[in-house]
Amino acid sequence: MSRVCQVTGKRVQTGNNVSHANNKTRRRFLPNLHKRRFWVASENRWVKLRVSTCAVRTIDKNGIDAVLAELRASGEKV
């Protein structure tokens, strides 16, 4: 399973570890992903999503119905 947020599209980024001597080695920055389930009252069911903490805040702000409508419009199967 890929490390991608279903709502925001956040994914793994790459960069460098930089030591005190300024040596650089490659590293990955992983998104803060969680499998969360949200109650959708209009459909009377739970929906499981793999979301970042940023996406959880977005869902709290806009509502799960609006977020699901956006996902379905973009072709995501939910």
From Swiss-Prot:
Gene Ontology annotations for the cellular component aspect, listed alphabetically: cytosolic large ribosomal subunit
GO BP annotations listed: translation
Pfam families in UniProt: Ribosomal_L28
Coiled coil: none
A GO term for molecular function: structural constituent of ribosome
UniProt keyword list: Ribonucleoprotein, Ribosomal protein
Stated family: Belongs to the bacterial ribosomal protein bL28 family.
HAMAP family: Ribosomal_bL28
Name of the protein described by the UniProt record: Large ribosomal subunit protein bL28
Species for this entry: Xylella fastidiosa (strain Temecula1 / ATCC 700964)
Lineage, uppermost ranks: Bacteria, Pseudomonadati, Pseudomonadota, Gammaproteobacteria, Lysobacterales
